[in-house]
A protein has these predicted regions:
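C-terminal lid/capping helical subdomain adjacent to the catalytic/cofactor pocket in oxidative enzymes
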Residues: 124-172
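Active-site substrate-recognition segment that forms the wall
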Residues: 2-128
């Protein structure tokens, strides 16, 4: 058993299970995104390329090239459908004929998403000692620093820079 003055629930796609134990029923669904990281030398790319109409992005990394995108509502229990990653690789090769698509490492990640596309940030309904911070969908990494700042302000008893009312769990 552990004790704490305050708990922050930021468990991604599993957060709604924890919230339910506190009486908050949050309709979180899991978007699944796919990517393939190709090894160094797969393509000489200096900046990210976005193929929005085709549903994928090609990004340079220190570890190679990443081809990623796709959205699939598949929950937490279904096995990955890597044919989605394969399809993005084929499309990328079509646009970048010199792209070497062999020896890639495929990955699937969970994106905790809500029906209104607005994350849950703020106190639990039944306990002011629990703060929620989840449901950012495919913008989780992008919005994480801003959410962390708001949560820290809230937990420390400060007035957050942004009104947390629109982000409350009770809106569902």
């Amino acid at each position: 058993r552990r004790e704490a003055d305050h708990i922050v629930v930021a468990a991604g796609a599993w957060s709604h299970y924890l919230a339910r134990t506190l009486g908050d029923h949050i309709p979180l669904e899991t978007e699944r995104g796919y990517n393939t990281t190709l090894p160094i030398g797969a393509f000489d790319l200096k900046r990210q390329l976005s193929f929005e109409e085709h549903g994928f992005i090609v990004s340079p990394l220190t570890t190679g090239i990443r081809v990623g995108g796709a959205v699939e509502l598949g929950g937490l229990k279904l096995p990955p459908n890597y044919s989605r990653a394969d399809a993005m690789l084929r499309k990328a090769k079509m646009f970048l004929p010199k792209l070497k698509i062999a020896n890639g490492r495929q990955w699937m990640g969970f994106r905790p998403s809500l029906p209104d596309s607005v994350p849950v940030i703020g106190p639990a309904t039944q306990s002011s000692r629990v703060t929620y911070a989840f449901g950012h969908g495919h913008l989780g990494l992008t919005q994480s620093a801003g959410t962390a700042k708001l949560v820290a302000q809230h937990v420390m008893g400060e007035t957050p820079e942004v009104d947390l009312f629109p982000y409350r769990a009770q809106r569902f």
